[in-house]
């Protein structure tokens, strides 16, 4: 819906009531929101929440199970941290309770892009950082509105 609103309008801000970020992979969500921000030329507002329905949580991300509220809050905080890193840093890494980026010991194998010490260990070709594409239009990120925390 946001992409449709971006295509049909030129001035209104485009926001979501809340993205339940605990249900999503933070890298995919960061890229999706950044793409919408690019398409709208910086008109995106991001609402984030941790979810309230156990039936959704357990089926979309078992780590978000609301039976353990403390764990759900930690997942929310870590997911938001990854989103902000993905948007604000050219290359980033993250080693948390729920997410580790880049995947440990992943060897760079991409003939179409040159290797760089910005994101890899040049001695053994393992990835040390990753990047999301595109970055948001708004720098460093679209405004974030938290429903919780």
Language model features with spans:
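Internal, glycine-rich beta/alpha segment that forms the wall or movable "lid"
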Residues: 25-149
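Core alpha/beta catalytic barrel or barrel-like domain that forms the active/cofactor pocket
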Residues: 12, 17, 47-51
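N-terminal beta1-alpha1-beta2 module of alpha/beta enzyme domains
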Residues: 1-14, 139-142
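The substrate-binding groove and active-site-proximal loops of carbohydrate-active enzymes
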Residues: 15-24, 67
